[in-house]
Amino acid sequence: MQGRAIWAEGPIHSFDLPSSSLERGGQALKSGASKTHAYMDEEVGTSTAEAWTWIVPSLSFIQGFMAGQAVLLMLFLGLFRYFFMTSSPGTRAQQQADLLQRVHAVRTSMDMRSHVPPYARVPYEQGVQACVQDLLSQVRYDPSEHAPESLDWLNVLVAQLLMSYRMSILNAGMCAGRNEDMDEPALPSTANAEKTAAKLALERVLNEAMQGRATKHFLDRLVVTDIDMGCRYPTFSHARVRPALHAKSTLVEIDFEYMDALTLGIDTRMWLHFPQWRFGSLAANLCMRVERFAGTLVLEIGTLPEPTPVQARVCLHPNFVLDAHLSTILGSKSKLQDVPKIEELFLARLRSWLEHNVVWPHFWHIPLPGIGTSPADPLA
């Protein structure tokens, strides 16, 4: 049979195959390989199609969900626009009618929810004097019959305020003392930690204030030699209400008294710049002590006859009492001590300053927070 090899013990004999048989065999192999590749391509295509069948439905669901939400939102906006909004403002009369309707509805609802008895007051258009009389009647205060009141509660508040100021001065001085070298002689102002802290704080304030004045060329650095911020507190009593002179408001008169030993001692040098710069200096040491300050304090809140912002005005009656003493030493070699004229001039200048700033008819104006004032207004 052709195409078969015969194996025997003897030598191997081969038969030659015709060329047509070889060609038919090669074509068979090629057709088998092409069928194999076609089958593999069919399998891959089937898996890819199955994957897309899972992806496409998920994308369609998200798109449909978003479209549904958009439709609901547009429907809600349309209904809101139709029921609660208007396309045009309308005429002025219609706007006013709508405003009155809204205000009436809100006012009616508020009256139904709250149960407040009706209050009546004098309209402001009747004048300030009528309003003041109405004010006194509402607070049940008759100035002609009401007895002076004690101010124990005010004494406690003022004492706490003064104590807070004293503690803040001491804290500021302690903070400044950490950065300064205390290589100074033993002075009365350094007798204890509190005086030392107050000395440092006051020296810093005084010397900084002297920098912007013309006297800085004539005065040397100020050294606080003695200081005592006191240990007592002022007392207020006999508060009474009085009508103001211009009949535009009322004022409160309060008697006060402060007895303590407020002490301040300063040492410096006064320079003479003639005929040359720093030709000579005059040493000066001053110590002032205030022992008693008493009088009548007047407090008035309101507006003046002319249109001004609301403010509080404070002044003293002219019969105030100020008991103070001043000790001085001038000179380095030959010293002038406790010259009476210097004490008289200094205390007279202090009293004159008080009379021209806080003694009636001069007031110390305290601006109060205003409504409707511009930020640029210094009194606002």
From Swiss-Prot:
Cytoplasmic topological segments: 86-380
KW Repeat (keyword) present: no
Location within or outside the cell: Endoplasmic reticulum membrane
Transmembrane regions: 65-85
Domain-level remarks: The SMP-LTD domain is a barrel-like domain that can bind various types of glycerophospholipids in its interior and mediate their transfer between two adjacent bilayers.
Function: Component of the ERMES/MDM complex, which serves as a molecular tether to connect the endoplasmic reticulum (ER) and mitochondria. Components of this complex are involved in the control of mitochondrial shape and protein biogenesis, and function in nonvesicular lipid trafficking between the ER and mitochondria. The MDM12-MMM1 subcomplex functions in the major beta-barrel assembly pathway that is responsible for biogenesis of all outer membrane beta-barrel proteins, and acts in a late step after the SAM complex.
Annotated protein name in UniProt: Maintenance of mitochondrial morphology protein 1
Lineage: Eukaryota, Fungi, Dikarya, Basidiomycota, Ustilaginomycotina
Gene field: MMM1
